[in-house]
Amino acid sequence: MTFCYPCRAFALLTRGFTSFMSGWPRIYYKLLNLPLSILVKSKSIPADPAPELGLDTSRPIMYVLPYNSKADLLTLRAQCLAHDLPDPLEPLEIDGTLLPRYVFIHGGPRVFTYYTPKEESIKLFHDYLDLHRSNPNLDVQMVPVSVMFGRAPGREKGEVNPPLRMLNGVQKFFAVLWLGRDSFVRFSPSVSLRRMADEHGTDKTIAQKLARVARMHFARQRLAAVGPRLPARQDLFNKLLASRAIAKAVEDEARSKKISHEKAQQNAIVLMEEIAANFSYEMIRLTDRILGFTWNRLYQGINVHNAERVRQLAHDGHELVYVPCHRSHMDYLLLSYVLYHQGLVPPHIAAGINLNFWPAGPIFRRLGAFFIRRTFKGNKLYSTVFREYLGELFSRGYSVEYFVEGGRSRTGRLLDPKTGTLSMTIQAMLRGGTRPITLIPIYIGYEHVMEVGTYAKELRGATKEKESLPQMLRGLSKLRNLGQGYVNFGEPMPLMTYLNQHVPDWRESIDPIEAVRPAWLTPTVNNIAADLMVRINNAGAANAMNLCCTALLASRQRSLTREQLTEQLNCYLDLMRNVPYSTDSTVPSASASELIDHALQMNKFEVEKDTIGDIIILPREQAVLMTYYRNNIAHMLVLPSLMAAIVTQHRHISRDVLMEHVNVLYPMLKAELFLRWDRDELPDVIDALANEMQRQGLITLQDDELHINPAHSRTLQLLAAGARETLQRYAITFWLLSANPSINRGTLEKESRTVAQRLSVLHGINAPEFFDKAVFSSLVLTLRDEGYISDSGDAEPAETMKVYQLLAELITSDVRLTIESATQGEG
């Protein structure tokens, strides 16, 4: 056999060249990865993709990216390796076939536009689907991934495209150079190719459809991340001035004040300048850097729950309205920071006009704040301009945030909602907008609120200090260890769905020009507001501080041994874990001992050591302040506390009688604390709590009766103390009603507060909300709604006395005597 040496040499050369070429991409990626590792610091969304998205790493995973970018691919690779996900550069071997683990949907633009490589995504999709046809056990998880460098939405005039368009190589280089530290990798829920193959087949048309759906997915995801383009401020004002509603309000202003039309129009422009935000992406980026640095030093962690449901709504095109509870001025910054890091657009925020002082006002305005006055009364032009501005935000697709409580809670409990802005939100729907508006209730919790000392002073009568630069600097100078922060997203409320269910003919009120107030608007808004408050509380977060404060404040001397405190925290934790307040509420996974150690680091408690062990003390000067944190989770424990109080008082009681007692008091508790259960749900909840209390050994169940267990009576008494002050307040009001059935509501509220203040002094009650005007006002309204007070103002003596007698059994005899003697003394 003859051998051709030139042929052999050619074969060796070809093999070497092929080997070199096959290794070249690896060398190329290594070289490219060197500058990227320095320039790019990306963030994964969600923070831990595999468990949060339910990815099964034991099954094949492939990644789908929107367009061909090696920088994006290597950024994705870094995040995959950091989270123990398969390396996208490693091919996927299936039944002896090697396939790339990543797919680019679009080839992407090039510097030289005439050169466009052949798009291979459809072929790859078809190859993957075809493997599923031949292998019935195969199930590849297709994970869409977006890699974004920067998130500036751009302006309506100026830039032709926002910076997140598909970039060619040169553009991508500068994007990485300038925005590498402001990048994120967004993992989406996986799509099962097995399900696709089984339900839709495996031919090429399905592959084409899959690629088309993926393109739509990425387009929506980009819009959810960057938001719509921003208008030039003057163009926005011109559009508002041209609206019929503002034009009419300007005419009315000129006529009523006897000024020229130009002067009235100038007044409207001044109001727009006062109200409107001046959103700046560069300010968002700068503030994000500052806050990231600050949070890492002040907070030990920011815990975010249920953000995926919000990302999905944004992806589906919903107009998002964030409705958080209001604990602190920190809420504005914290929520925007969290949303930004969840891959969502920071919202336009309705901020109180009191924050519009230099330099905070201009900064907040560039971060998306628009300012709202405390009242609209007597200024029709202002109310019209504000309503039209809010409607314009909705029509343009911007997310919005406002605090439905109207102001910061001074007690740690939710305030009764203020419905003005919510009403305007529904009026915006009645203008005939096409995008669905969805309200997102949000629970914000802290282990330290910097204003809590000021709140206590204000509740005791001090004048509220006006916000200013010196006050802000004093507050910032006091910031130390703030512990943990909590942002829990509650159950969304799609307004269209709500109106369809409760006001079926609401579309008949749509008017694209004029703001309308149909007869159903006010009661519907009130119901929505109340529902929102319930949903906010449903997303409550228990933490080390509020649990320890609850236990120590339940003790008469505000002190417990470490063993007693541990036992009490275990009681709370087991109740919350085994009978959850709601599916949206969160409970620490740490042990009671670990929570105590963490709380002690906050320097709110004192520890006395002796030969027996540690005694943990809540100092008297701190007790008033710590009620704030206890009140954050009062709603989560009030029902088991009430049950414990009833069982403790009676020593043994049948389930039916217990249910009767709870049923009498529950409407007041529900209204005050925005509890989630309806009356018909109570029997099941009480049964579940009773079974859990039996499991803990707090009570025994004998012949359908609940008996106190003497061995754990202290734990049961401390649990019961959580309802103690609430029951005392109810006793005050019901005694006053019984003693004077014809008392008017205003006098009833005033006298209730007077007796409560007296009780607070004589019996050392440290809770400022004990005699809070708003609490008694809400209670009296509930009594009217429940029929204890008639429309004419008179009470029903027999019913009120019956309830008072029930309450009198649940409070101590000395407190009862103080209540009764106080009213007798006044008489």
Swiss-Prot record:
Main location: membrane
Membrane topology designation: Peripheral membrane protein
tRNA processing recorded as keyword: no
GO molecular function, one term: glycerol-3-phosphate O-acyltransferase activity
UniProt record, GO biological process: CDP-diacylglycerol biosynthetic process; fatty acid metabolic process
CDD domains reported in the protein's UniProt record: LPLAT_DHAPAT-like (cd07993)
Residues that span the membrane, as ranges: none
Family, as annotated: Belongs to the GPAT/DAPAT family.
NCBIfam families: plsB, PRK04974.1
Protein name as catalogued: Glycerol-3-phosphate acyltransferase
Source species of the chain: Escherichia coli (strain SMS-3-5 / SECEC)
Gene name as annotated: plsB
